[in-house]
A protein has these predicted regions:
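C-terminal motif of bacterial Sec signal peptides marking the signal peptidase cleavage site
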Residues: 15-19
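Short, low-complexity disordered leader/linker segments with a strong preference
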Residues: 2, 20-21
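Bacterial N-terminal signal peptides that target proteins for export
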Residues: 1-9
């Protein structure tokens, strides 16, 4: 009888767990681009050692707070290029603000906060036509 209860309990547990973990996020878009300032890649000292970083983030501009979109970020390479790969499947289509923070490793933004989340005027539409692929934002010129 005890063995039957243990087996029944284990079967119930496995049945409940069968519904967990199988959901994959909806497909999205990988987003890439290149940051330049004065015609040169946006860089900071010590980037090769990843002490200095140029952090790039996409923040959703919500028209519907329940649209399920969230922010995504990455670090730019020394040549100014970046690629944001969203939560396993890419960034969800919609309007986003692009934030750029150039930190040489001392916590100070060499861009003076001009392109931080609160101040950036860089806005992009991530197209539903690119779901499952990549959208290139091209050369993003910072002044």
């Amino acid at each position: 009888m005890c063995r039957f209860i243990v087996i029944l309990g284990l079967a119930a547990f496995l049945a409940l767990m069968g519904g967990c973990g199988g959901h994959k996020p909806d497909a999205g878009v990988n987003v890439k681009g290149k940051l330049t300032k004065g015609g040169q890649p946006v860089t900071v000292p010590n980037m090769a050692a990843r002490v200095g970083t140029v952090k790039v983030e996409l923040y959703p501009i919500h028209t519907d707070p329940n649209d399920g979109r969230s922010s995504f970020g990455t670090l730019a390479n020394e040549d100014g290029t970046f690629e944001i790969v969203g939560e396993g499947q890419g960034v969800k289509p919609g309007k986003y603000k692009l934030s750029v923070i150039a930190d040489p490793g001392d916590g100070q933004d060499q861009l003076g906060g001009k392109y931080g989340e609160a101040n950036s005027t860089l806005e992009f539409e991530i197209s539903a036509n690119n779901v499952g692929g990549t959208q290139n934002l091209g050369d993003i010129k910072l002044d």
